[in-house]
Amino acid sequence: MAQKPNFLKKIISAGLVTASTATIVAGFSGVAMGAVMQYNRTTNAAATTVDGAGFDQTGAGVNLPVATNSVITANSNNAITFNTPNGNLNSLFLDTANTLAVTINENTTLGFVTNVTKQGNFFNFTIGAGKSLTITGHGITAQQAATTKSAQNVVSKVNAGAAINDNDLSGVGSIDFTAAPSVLEFNLINPTTQEAPLTLGDNAKIVNGANGILNITNGFVKVSDKTFAGIKTINIGDNQGLMFNTTPDAANALNLQGGGNTINFNGRDGTGKLVLVSKNGNATEFNVTGSLGGNLKGVIEFDTTAAAGKLIANGGAANAVIGTDNGAGRAAGFIVSVDNGNAATISGQVYAKDIVIQSANAGGQVTFEHLVDVGLGGKTNFKTADSKVIITENASFGSTDFGNLAVQIVVPNNKILTGNFIGDAKNNGNTAGVITFNANGTLVSGNTDPNIVVTNIKAIEVEGAGIVQLSGIHGAELRLGNAGSIFKLADGTVINGPVNQNPLVNNNALAAGSIQLDGSAIITGDIGNGAVNAALQDITLANDASKILTLSGANIIGANAGGAIHFQANGGTIQLTSTQNNILVDFDLDVTTDQTGVVDASSLTNNQTLTINGSIGTIGANTKTLGRFNVGSSKTILNAGDVAINELVMENDGSVHLTHNTYLITKTINAANQGKIIVAADPINTDTALADGTNLGSAESPLSNIHFATKAANGDSILHIGKGVNLYANNITTTDANVGSLHFRSGGTSIVSGTVGGQQGLKLNNLILDNGTTVKFLGDITFNGGTKIEGKSILQISSNYITDHIESADNTGTLEFVNTDPITVTLNKQGAYFGVLKQVMVSGPGNIAFNEIGNGVAHAIAVDSISFENASLGASLFLLSGTPLDVLTIKSTVGNGTVDNFNAPILVVSGIDSMINNGQVIGDQKNIIALSLGSDNSITVNSNTLYAGIRTTKTNQGTVTLSGGIPNNPGTIYGLGLENGDPKLKQVTFTTDYNNLGSIIATNVTINDDVTLTTGGIAGTDFDGKITLGSINGNANVKFVDRTFSHPTSMIVSTKANQGTVTYLGNALVGNIGSSDIPVASVRFTGNDSGVGLQGNIHSQNIDFGTYNLTILNSDVILGGGTTAINGEIDLLTNNLIFANGTSTWGNNTSLSTTLNVSNGNVGQIVIAEGAQVNATTTGTTTIKIQDNANANFSGTQTYTLIQGGARFNGTLGAPNFDVTGNNIFVKYELIRDANQDYVLTRTNDVLNVVTTAVGNSAIANAPGVHQNIAICLESTDTAAYNNMLLAKDSSDVATFIGAIATDTGAAVATVNLNDTQKTQDLLGNRLGALRYLSNSETADVGGSETGAVSSGDEAIDQVSYGVWAKPFYNIAEQDKKGGLAGYKAKTAGVVVGLDTLANDNLMIGAAIGITKTDIKHQDYKKGDKTDIKGLSFSLYGAQQLVKNFFAQGSAIFTLNKVKSKSQRYFFDANGKMNKQIAAGNYDNITFGGNLMFGYDYNALQGVLVTPMAGLSYLKSSNENYKETGTTVANKRIHSKFSDRIDLIVGAKVTGSAMNINDIVIYPEIHSFVVHKVNGKLSKAQSMLDGQTAPFISQPDRTAKTSYNIGLSANIRSDAKMEYGIGYDFNAASKYTAHQGTLKVRINF
């Protein structure tokens, strides 16, 4: 409220001003306005306006006051006094050649004041104390001037009828403010502007300004005399202005606001303007006491376009001259107008919201000698022409628009320039303006958004040595003018422009300065790509691994001498993002801490080339690697210096080019099979070096390629590979054939993967290993030149190898094969031998084949020793054809595998015969060698012990002669071939006794006469081929050690009948021995507890199996000759043992085992031919193994012969032991001897016995009808279920399977179905019982019940004739197993909704609909079976009142049921495993019926009503026919007839008096009934499986006939409209219980 008077004052003041202005306008309009007559009053003496004295009059002695709007024409040399209160006169017209005094004694308004006709004279005004003179400047038109009238109302023209322009104040002289407060106000009716101001001439001076107030209310006024600066108070209104273009006080200076004077900017907006014009001959310096403008008001312009000038804070430059720094103390604006050569100097602090720098022509300069601050949200604009601003202290220019002008802001050393600078706010496409720092300085944002500082200006410069700190976003070029110039970029700085691209302002030269980073930064343009000296000396990244320098330029140029990008101790990242095709980084990359720093060029594509023309890191004693270099998919060239990179990342098949320098690349990261390394040494410097520890690619992610570029001048390009260097690439290739050599001379171990040379037929040149270097090649290798291995170096080969030759001049080189797969080494035959290798070492499991091409006379490789090492067990080394074994040292350290799996490395010789003599080193006792013949040549062994076996690569190839044995010292060899199935030697001859500790795999083996061969041992125990006993006489011997495995087709023969012995010293598989016409002398089996497998026939004068167990492994095995002794088990399997002739004696330990395969009828038999006899006492147990997987669905008995020719069997078989395998448990077996003395096996069907026994031991043993149904099932042997059952392996599974089929749940489902309908009938009885009371006076005072027979709830008495009711209910019932019938658990939920009415006083009728859902879970042996019943019922019901207190009630019901059943069935798979399946039934059922009850009501006690009741109920359920689905073999078709039931119902209910509790009436009730089934039956359902001939019989009804009910209820009524009820009932019968809850809602109408 305190503000209201001021507010009202402003309103009133505004109204008065408006009214006054309107009056003036109307007056000046004169006749045209038709309002007031305009007069021209002339003076003739001292004049006063209020009475008109001294003016022309209407007559003598009459003083007519000067009227409003009159023009006063001064004709006499007399003073004029304006004393009309609030006088509003048109103007003053000087028409006398005198300067006149004008006194303002009352507030007066004047239009023009002119001396147009007397220009040498003026009006000197004196304004009285507290009075005001308001100048409107209003002129008159020619029409007005010609029609003005005198006091006599006669036309008296002004200015001879000529017009006087608006704002003509040429007649103003001095203005004397006599006493405070005197006011001079300019309220121009035609406001002037700065461009055309109202000008007060040189004669317009101020006298006693200390008493005055100057108001510039409307218009722009220019003053020419310094005295105006002495006015005590100057007020400038909004959008109005005052211009000082005045004489100076002294020495060209004008003092403003001295002596307490003030210049104020009034108005709400504070947009008044003060213009200070510097002009030669006038004031050029303006000394300001205090400051101009403030509180965001006042626009001050300093104009030096005519002459250089200075705006000075009188208190010194450290004081404010424009605005103040106290919150909102800034001036609204500050404009500096300059011109070329006419500079403006501001010697004081400037605080203005907006600053404008404008130069009339290019070259204007403004110097701020102290602070400049536009504050938050302030702005600076440059206009008109190019200009230069020099600041001396910190400056804040805010949002600065260079206006597309060549503006330069110069910042001195150690000062801060604040602002947001834009080249052209109107067109962002233009770039203009330069910010120049003399040395140290800071450029920061002056906006609330600190990010954007510079937008599209030409440049930010550093002229001298110093650090300029930048932050935010700068759209400008950075220029460095001194070697010591540094730009320091804060975290997040963005430079949208180049660095050192163009010369500094005034074409000052660029210099190799530096850039330092305090955090992440972005530079989008080229760096150092300008003229001479543009290259930068240093770029130093932030000492923070997380910070990133993003460079988007295509040329990043450093100084030739020492130009470097420095990664500090913690690293940092350089990100290269240029989209240009060619990108050059001409800097060394200096790394402070090993494995730090990142260069990220991941955004580059394969169309771009990145060149790093400088060193990266340091290689040497103090190696420092760049942490990571990601080249993206670009072509990256690393030249002009050594390179040390910890991780080189290549994406999308990028490539890196290595020139003639040294490169350390600890690791490459690339997608598998991507990335290329190009070895591109220049024509003069042909060598490229990979420093120790380099890894190109990896085993998991090899490079795509390592490539030798176009050959150098000398024809080759050499890659020198340091210690531990690994090269992983798919291919190592060359552009030119025979160019590219790999030299490993630094020691250590290296790996080279991929294919080396040979692509498109272009081979590499050569390979050199020296100085103890180990190199492992993983892929195919192709060199045009030779391979040299010296200085104890090792060449490891994993794949095919092509080279001219392999040599070791100092005989120290090792060629090692580490291949896992077969490989070939291809060499060129030579004219002479090269240096011999120390050794060839085989270390891998793959085979190696040497191959030579060409026509030379000397082998391309020579070696002293061959050694098998590491994983070479089983590997084969194929020597060059024509290389003999005679002089080679052959060693092994790989052993020979396990005892059961002998193995050996293999040396293959071909194209030449070899001889092995004593003293030659071949293997040792723990490391056996395998020698193999690769051609049809021979090996002669004269060495007593040869730690080797001999093999062949092709069957019937190679001859071996063994002569190393001496008397009492048989020769030793480790096998002739390895095992059955291997290629066979063509011929083996034993000339001396021999122990062969291996197998014999040979087409022909000859054991000379009188020579004994013992064969089999650690190297093998197989025999495949033919052994001939004796060279002539047949008297040779062969012994087979334990576990001899003869091939079934093997043969042992003698050169003479009944000569030669064969002995088995242990277990054996035996082939053919002798023949029927040339039997051998003896065949003996001498081992203990051993067995023999007979695969062929034996013909010998004497066969002695000793206690061996015999297994017959061929379909027919013949034993022939003289005598045969057997005293062990004979296992026939399913084969025949034929005794062809002679006598066979079976000892006491003899037993017989045979196998019957029922599926094909095969059984092992003994066949005793006509010429043979078998003598045996009673044998041991006869084991009969039966594999019975055949179907048991057969009838009768099947027979199989065990001994044929039983009449020639002198003995008795022991009691049989049947060992049945398979899944057939339904068959019985026996062994008998028939009439012809043959022994016979019998097989009999036993299904009925197995099933009956299984069911008798199961849970369904006592289920009613189950045994009858099982008999029916087993009679139908053609059903799928029957045949599936025969797959069972477990009798308990059989009982489960058949029990699920032979039992059912029909009785339970039918019972529950009828019970559900009965529940709905009971609920209808509830309603009938209630309505009956409406017509019975005996019940009028007793709460009604709705409990009918077997009811489940109580109802209150109805007091209305009709209503709608709903009763939801929930029932849980459980029937335990009874009479062998499986029980069940049932849950029923439902609701009945009815509508009824009274037909008359004694008859009620109604209809209802009910919905029920019952879930049945069957129990006991039917557990897991489920049935769901959904019912929809429709009912009619009624009640009739008979004679007093007697009544009848009844109902009829019709129910539609949807029944879904899920019954468990089973299925056996082929392995006899039982799997559960679900047989689903889905059928509809109809149930209908009705009931009729009679009863009597009487009041037994006061308030107690007893109602005995009795009646009958009848229900009937329809037939069902459906087929189950869902099982494989056990779906049944079901057909059932109807079910029905007649029940007698007897019981009573007792209803108590109503209880009123808070107007809520409660009616209690209790009841009990007995229900007895008097007639009816459940349906006898019939079911059949597909293919079944007779139906199953359904299980009978075992439920109790009598059940009992007791229940209680309560009905609640709150008003006549609504009733609610709740009830509970319990039902019980034999092994049956049920609980039911009921709710009720009823609306009475």
UniProtKB/Swiss-Prot annotation:
Q: Which InterPro entries match?
A: Autotransporte_beta (IPR005546), Autotransporte_beta_dom_sf (IPR036709), OM_autotransptr_brl_dom (IPR006315), OmpB_passenger_Rickettsia (IPR022095), OmpB_ricketsia (IPR048195)
The record's annotation in Gene3D superfamilies points to: Autotransporter beta-domain (2.40.128.130)
Positions annotated as propeptide: 1329-1352
Keywords attached to this Swiss-Prot or TrEMBL record, sorted alphabetically, are: Cell outer membrane, Membrane, Periplasm, Secreted, Transmembrane, Transmembrane beta strand, Virulence
Give the matching Pfam families.
Answer: Autotransporter, rOmpB_passenger
- Family per UniProt? Belongs to the rickettsiae OmpA/OmpB family.
Q: What is this protein called?
A: Outer membrane protein B
- Identify the species of origin: Rickettsia typhi (strain ATCC VR-144 / Wilmington)
